[in-house]
């Protein structure tokens, strides 16, 4: 089975912490109105010894009640349920436990993609394309591996943020003093990354790569770029087909930008935002002296299609390294490291999101720790940085 991204499921990243913080299992709640689906998801998750399903409930209201009683790291949340649906439940869940990570389980339909995007805007951390039948869930190894990988990565992120949810602190009955003294496992932050040089030439193109947590990060960054930035913006966000169409629509509505899912052969023009469509690599090639979009079904890179690395390499060839401003936002894995290294070596400029503001510091962490970034910034500073850099004198 495909995992929804046109790629085989990724293996666990090298050096990734076990469990959520190298110790206790990731604590998960499964929320779905189908008892059969809940059972299948629970078995898939508990097939990994570093995950423990501590609650399994049938609607959003039950999830809120369960979260008040349980300490959780990750919630796998269905979208359409009786009593309280997933979209309605998200703000209520985050009000109880602001740092808990929520993964939406969504069907690969336009309606499912649109609601998933609204859920991400409301605070969900990620989504997973849900198979359409219980038979597919029960027998789909790719789906199980993707689910487990995301739960473990987001569980680790929750603990690194110091957010192991303390639902037990909320009951009306007195809490034993011994319980109150318990602390979450210690978290060791990585040392500050080395910072490289800043390009001296006004860029002709802006290229952005993102994955887990990317839609929310893109909305934040692009909201600062709707005026004052004339360069074309090319974005590869790891997403399946259908979802990328909806992502472009949401960027247009929320950020006031001219965003669209890229089409093969269309020219790359100033002031437009191009989104790589799901299951295609988005490249820039030159035809008759003009830069145009080229969509390919070349093999996945870094287990991804679309992938950031081929986009970066093609932009480097089309525009020249010194004319490229690249940015890597939150995401799992190391996609973008090789392509961005080539951009920087050719004189381009690279910035990345910092660990504290990333949902998962995999992709930005890889380029930051490689020492090739001109700046490693909190999410709220990235949009203003890009705008200032892009509007500098030539």
Curated annotation (Swiss-Prot):
This enzyme's EC code(s): 3.1.1.61, 3.5.1.44
Ranges of residues in domain Response regulatory: 27-145
Keyword Isomerase recorded: no
CDD domains per the UniProt record, alphabetical: CheB_Rec, REC_CheB-like
Protein location: Cytoplasm
Active site: 211, 238, 335
UniProt xrefs under Gene3D superfamilies: 3.40.50.2300, Methylesterase CheB, C-terminal domain
Catalysed conversion reaction: [protein]-L-glutamate 5-O-methyl ester + H2O = L-glutamyl-[protein] + methanol + H(+); L-glutaminyl-[protein] + H2O = L-glutamyl-[protein] + NH4(+)
Keyword set, alphabetical order: Chemotaxis, Cytoplasm, Hydrolase, Phosphoprotein
GO molecular function: phosphorelay response regulator activity; protein-glutamate methylesterase activity; protein-glutamine glutaminase activity
PTM summary: Phosphorylated by CheA. Phosphorylation of the N-terminal regulatory domain activates the methylesterase activity.
One record GO biological process: chemotaxis
Domain CheB-type methylesterase: start-end pairs: 191-393
Domain of life: Bacteria
InterPro entries: CheB-like, CheB_C, CheY-like_superfamily, Sig_transdc_resp-reg_Me-estase, Sig_transdc_resp-reg_receiver
Residues where 4-aspartylphosphate is found: 78
Low complexity: bias regions: 15-24
Region (Disordered): 1-24
First-tier enzyme category under EC: hydrolase
Protein family according to the UniProt entry: Belongs to the CheB family.
Job description of the protein: Involved in chemotaxis. Part of a chemotaxis signal transduction system that modulates chemotaxis in response to various stimuli. Catalyzes the demethylation of specific methylglutamate residues introduced into the chemoreceptors (methyl-accepting chemotaxis proteins or MCP) by CheR. Also mediates the irreversible deamidation of specific glutamine residues to glutamic acid.
Domain comment quoted from the record: Contains a C-terminal catalytic domain, and an N-terminal region which modulates catalytic activity.
Protein name: Protein-glutamate methylesterase/protein-glutamine glutaminase
Species this chain originates from: Azospirillum brasilense
